Amino acid sequence: MNYTKAKYIMGAAKVSQLPEDTGVEVAFAGRSNAGKSSALNTLTDQKGLARVSKTPGRTQLINLFDLGDNKRLVDLPGYGYAKVSEAIKKQWQSEMENYLTTRKCLGGIVLLVDSRHELKEFDSLMIEMAISFDLNLHILLTKADKLNNKERAQANKMIESFLKTFIRTDKISYQLFSSLSKMGLDKLKEKLDIWYQ
């Protein structure tokens, strides 16, 4: 797949505003400061494709990018310490759940988790949701260039230990990743290529 062809299509506030539910979509999700926009820009080799905001949590829309052949990348709203009201946060969360549970063309979810921190409530929720709805999930442990080898091993172990608490995790995979050094970029592309087949 040629990810450099990605073109912005639209931003939707609600799932009902999305284009027809056909083809294949891969959704990127993550807390506001997990490096989601940077990862999308690195994947597509386009610096400004997904806006890297200085105010985390500004992605309030479901943003879609066309890859051709009825294949799309989806940037889900950043979730976390956004300076918005609880009511708006709840609205985002319900739209996100709606997207993940009703979108038939969803080929998989890439969940971005900051490798330097423990799993947050949102991360755990996303993993649990993927398992309960039998969705493909690939966890990117981002900002791994900032870790030494011991810390990288600890980040992998953290995910491994969490996944051990579930019976079925055959559709879940994880890897270290860095937008800055492009560490793990080829592995990410390989995973997406399978989902887009």
From Swiss-Prot:
Family membership: Belongs to the TRAFAC class TrmE-Era-EngA-EngB-Septin-like GTPase superfamily. EngB GTPase family.
GO CC annotations, alphabetized: cytosol
Organism per entry: Francisella philomiragia subsp. philomiragia (strain ATCC 25017 / CCUG 19701 / FSC 153 / O#319-036)
Descriptive protein name: Probable GTP-binding protein EngB
GO molecular function, one term: GTP binding
NCBIfam families: GTPase_YsxC
EngB-type G domain sequence ranges: 22-197
Positions bound to Mg(2+): 37, 59
